[in-house]
């Protein structure tokens, strides 16, 4: 094992002076974390402040909220502030707000009702700041508006209601589309596009000059319907017949929603349908839309084929409506991620460019691409990855971004000039740390957020001087003082090397009173999905994993291992799992467990694994290997067969069933011997109202195991009535975590020998499965 760090107390490089001394959360007191402090969510945690930067003539202005709820305009340059919205003008119970670009009005969302992961319904109101008047966006609204957004330059608001698009302007509303309904979505995504493609609730984009609106129309006609029953439906007395929610949910190889591209001239209300010919209609996914001009000359979309291993960037000239493929790529060695990173740059040496991230070289890096097509210009390179573009400053010709240059578990903030190609760190990039930043509208200032591994903080900087902060935004001094009362888990990060040569990142938590001469139970806590990352230098949440490490009756060591297929270690590392999800990932977890057992303190009779969602699937696949290393497992909301999951996620990694039938059969959890041979127990938890990973997965998995001969002393299935993927309905999470705590406690108490079995149970098992029950 190559030790990378222990709380990362690294030396300080001379190039960049750090904003403050490291403040490691080492505790120093005698208190141990308790269940109530950690579960179901961490109560001892860092605070962070989210600032709404304002795009005005003067850079460095942002909105903050006072203790009484008033909205304050802060000016960094003049160090002054002004109350824009008094506390008594703030609607009670509002959910969110957005300022008009000229700060003369505020758009409020109230009466929030959650729909899916990102989408919600609400009422919207417009507050005229000067007059103090509050006007409904739609006079007859009934908590049914799906999305609303200010134009970047004028008084217009685009909004979606009943899946139809509307334009509001100075109190006058124009309905743009008339065909919205259960199967037609204008300007908002359907379920699968929201969940798997955009990761957001809108599908409309104003041009920079506000004169045009690009939007997508989704047609779900013919997409199969999945029905979710709600047994209680938030009622005190359950209805005799459950409410049934019908969702158009395309599973693997089923019909996908089709998508159309539309342009709207806002002044004339003239709408144009732009033919999308990058791929056939039934083989098309639109992943991104971006304006490639400072006005409205050109707009582009990113098109994928159905299985997302081929990509075309198509530019549309707005006036002529002509389309042109300006870039394409073959990614059939794996898949192509939809990074949503296109941004217009403008003129560079007499030619117009846009910026994007691509991993075509094997590592994700920043490139300039000509707007009209042509040879790209690489701005970053190396065996590390750009994680995100934070800001493009066209005046200074700088792109700000975060990367893994120091190590795949870290994040540092840099700028790169697209004039000189010089890359400059904004932080000390010679130490293991996790940073991000939020830049002002014109790029002159930024909030630097240090997120770990030490106690997080936020500070304000000018881009002219990254060495000296202008002010502290969030110090978390109170958290640091609080932590001094505690004796905390000892966290370390290291790598283990596979026989094939790849290295896996590991995060280890040891009990606060760890004694290397004692034996400790261990719980592996993977997620492990494609492109994901669990092992990072971000703040170690004092959650359930920290609790089971701290409780004197439990004292578990936890290992989190990022297996092959996870993110930020290059395309080859990610793509290794293509067409066979769960195979290499499970091998890697087993290998890591065997490496763990080289430690004398690891109790080989009490090695568990627990995961949620993809992690629950990986838990089952790991136990399925029948390695004998793991003695118990817990799968929360798991996929059990990817033929039961949605098409746009699954086919990206597995292709269609027609192309990869054997791969799907092997990926499904289907072998039972590993479960039958467990020394301990296997627990499945799932919410019956899960609209993402359907309860069907848990039902099929438990049936497979029961029919395969897994006995009642080895298997428990726990459902949570009406709960979604997060298991939060009606205090379900409280029960869930108590069950988890009981499970790990019982497994620690379990002795290696088989518990006694009643004679009746022996006879029944023998009759059912033809087994000879041991005396």
From Swiss-Prot:
Enzyme Commission number, as recorded: 3.4.14.5
One Gene Ontology term, aspect cellular component: extracellular region
Protease recorded as keyword: yes
Cellular compartment(s): Secreted
Any one biological process term the GO annotation gives: proteolysis
Record has Signal as a keyword: yes
InterPro entries in UniProt: AB_hydrolase_fold (IPR029058), Pept_S9_AS (IPR002471), Peptidase_S9_cat (IPR001375), Peptidase_S9B_N (IPR002469), Serine_Prot_S9B/DPPIV (IPR050278)
Pfam families assigned to the protein according to its UniProt record, in alphabetical order: DPPIV_N, Peptidase_S9
Keywords: Aminopeptidase, Glycoprotein, Hydrolase, Protease, Secreted, Serine protease, Signal, Virulence
Signal peptide: 1-15
Enzyme class: hydrolase
Glycosylated residues (UniProt): 81, 111, 170, 219
SUPFAM superfamilies (UniProt xref): alpha/beta-Hydrolases, DPP6 N-terminal domain-like
Reaction(s) catalysed (UniProt annotation): Release of an N-terminal dipeptide, Xaa-Yaa-|-Zaa-, from a polypeptide, preferentially when Yaa is Pro, provided Zaa is neither Pro nor hydroxyproline
GO molecular function: aminopeptidase activity; dipeptidyl-peptidase activity; serine-type endopeptidase activity
Catalytic center residues: 613, 690, 725
Family as reported in the entry's similarity comment: Belongs to the peptidase S9B family.
Record function comment: Extracellular dipeptidyl-peptidase which removes N-terminal dipeptides sequentially from polypeptides having unsubstituted N-termini provided that the penultimate residue is proline. Contributes to pathogenicity.
Protein name from the UniProt record: Dipeptidyl peptidase 4
């Amino acid at each position: 094992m190559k030790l990378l760090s222990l709380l990362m107390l690294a030396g300080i490089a001379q190039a960049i002076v750090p904003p403050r001394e490291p403040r490691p959360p080492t505790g120093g007191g005698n208190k141990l974390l308790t269940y109530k402090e950690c579960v179901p969510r961490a109560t001892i945690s860092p605070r962070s402040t989210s600032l709404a930067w304002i795009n005005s003539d003067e850079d460095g202005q942002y909105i903050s909220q006072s203790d009484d709820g008033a909205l304050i305009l802060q000016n960094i340059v003049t160090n002054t502030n002004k109350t824009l919205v008094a506390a008594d003008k703030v609607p009670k119970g509002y959910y969110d707000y957005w300022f008009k670009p000229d700060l003369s009005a505020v758009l409020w969302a109230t009466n929030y009702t959650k729909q899916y992961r990102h989408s919600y319904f609400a009422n919207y109101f417009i507050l005229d700041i000067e007059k103090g008047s509050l006007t409904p966006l739609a006079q007859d609204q009934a908590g049914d508006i799906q999305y609303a957004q200010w134009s970047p330059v004028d008084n217009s608001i685009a909004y979606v209601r009943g899946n139809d698009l509307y334009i509001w302007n100075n109190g006058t509303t124009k309905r743009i589309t008339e065909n919205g309904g259960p199967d037609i979505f204008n300007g908002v995504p359907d379920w699968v596009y929201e969940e798997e493609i955009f990761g957001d609730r809108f599908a409309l984009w104003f041009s920079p000059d506000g004169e045009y609106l690009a939007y997508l129309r989704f047609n779900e006609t013919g997409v199969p319907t999945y029905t979710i029953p709600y047994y209680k439906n938030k009622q005190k007395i359950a209805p005799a017949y459950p409410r049934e929610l019908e969702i158009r949910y395309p599973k693997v190889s089923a019909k996908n929603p089709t998508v159309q591209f539309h342009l709207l001239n806002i002044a004339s209300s003239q709408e144009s349908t732009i033919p999308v010919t990058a791929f056939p209609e039934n083989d098309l996914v639109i992943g991104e839309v971006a304006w490639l001009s400072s006005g409205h000359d050109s707009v582009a979309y990113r098109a994928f084929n159905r299985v997302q291993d081929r990509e075309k960037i198509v530019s549309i000239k707005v006036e002529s409506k002509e389309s042109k493929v300006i870039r394409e790529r073959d990614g059939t060695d794996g898949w192509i991620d939809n990074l949503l990173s296109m941004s217009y740059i403008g003129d560079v040496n007499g030619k117009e460019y846009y910026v994007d991230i691509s991993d075509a070289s094997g590592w994700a890096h920043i490139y300039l691409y000509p707007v009209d097509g042509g040879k790209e210009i690489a701005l970053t390179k190396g065996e590390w990855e750009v994680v995100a573009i934070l800001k493009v400053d066209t005046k200074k010709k700088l792109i700000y971004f975060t990367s893994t240059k120091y190590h795949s578990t870290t994040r540092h903030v840099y700028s790169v000039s697209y004039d000189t190609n010089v890359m400059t760190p904004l932080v000390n990039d010679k130490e293991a740390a996790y940073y991000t930043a939020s830049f002002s509208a014109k790029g002159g200032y930024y909030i630097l957020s240090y997120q770990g591994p030490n106690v997080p903080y936020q500070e304000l900087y000018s881009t002219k001087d990254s060495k000296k902060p202008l002010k502290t935004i969030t110090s978390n001094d109170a958290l640091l003082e609080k932590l001094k009362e505690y004796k905390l888990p000892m966290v370390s990060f290291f790598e283990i090397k596979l026989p094939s040569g790849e290295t896996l990142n590991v995060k280890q938590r040891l009990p606060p009173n760890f004694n290397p001469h004692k034996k400790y139970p261990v719980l592996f806590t993977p997620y492990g999905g494609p492109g994901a990352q669990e092992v990072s230098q971000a703040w170690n949440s004092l959650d359930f994993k920290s609790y089971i490490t701290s409780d004197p009756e439990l004292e578990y060591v936890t290992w989190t291992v990022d297996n092959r297929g996870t993110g930020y270690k290059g395309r080859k590392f990610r793509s290794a799992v293509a067409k066979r999800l769960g195979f290499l990932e499970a091998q890697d977890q087993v290998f890591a467990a065997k490496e763990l057992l080289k430690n004398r303190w690891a109790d080989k009779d009490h090695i568990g694994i627990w995961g949620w969602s993809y992690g629950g699937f990986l838990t089952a696949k790991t136990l399925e290997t029948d390695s004998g290393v793991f003695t118990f497992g817990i799968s929360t909301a798991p996929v059990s067969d990817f033929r039961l999951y949605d098409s746009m996620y699954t086919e990206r990694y597995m292709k269609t069933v027609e192309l990869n039938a054997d791969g799907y059969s092997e990926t499904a959890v289907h072998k039972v011997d590993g479960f039958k041979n467990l020394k301990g127990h296997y627990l499945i938890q799932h919410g019956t109202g899960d609209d993402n990973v359907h309860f069907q997965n848990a039902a099929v998995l438990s049936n497979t195991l029961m029919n395969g001969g897994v006995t009642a002393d080895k298997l428990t299935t726990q459902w949570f009535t009406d709960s979604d993927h997060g298991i939060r309905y009606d205090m379900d999470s409280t029960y869930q975590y108590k069950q988890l705590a009981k499970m790990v406690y019982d497994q620690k108490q379990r002795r290696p020998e088989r518990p006694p079995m009643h004679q009746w149970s022996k006879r029944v098992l023998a009759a059912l499965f033809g087994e000879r029950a041991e005396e």
